[in-house]
Amino acid sequence: MTENPDQKEKLINNMELLPNMVNEAIRLISPVIYMRRTTTEETQVGEQKIGPQEKVVLYYGAANRDPDIFTNPDKFDIERENAKKHLAFGYGRHLCLGKHMANMQLAEVYKQILERFPDMHQSDEWKVVPNNFTHSISEMPVTFKPE
């Protein structure tokens, strides 16, 4: 939100956008970077044939920024109509059981931060945990005025 002050202001003025903002944030920065799956039968993706029992890697960031699905996929837009179509929590029988809990927790955290510290902004670069499987922030310095 601090990188997109116009979107932050829009959200502060209309908190009904909060659930969609959470989906849009997750779409842009998926908590899981990739997942490996094993095919059960022969299939084809584009021109690539994939045999049964082959390992495939699914990169969520690529899917969540697919320009055929998301217009201006690199833009953070809390009013994006299809933000909920992200695949950050998987899909179908592989859907993460914690998806709804994570969405509720993120919505509540953002609500509390925006209500208590509306002027909060990032004061330095954020640091990511060195990990090739999950995308986690280890440090994000912020500045705000106390209540």
Regions inferred by a protein language model and the residue ranges of each:
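Cytochrome P450
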Residues: 1-147
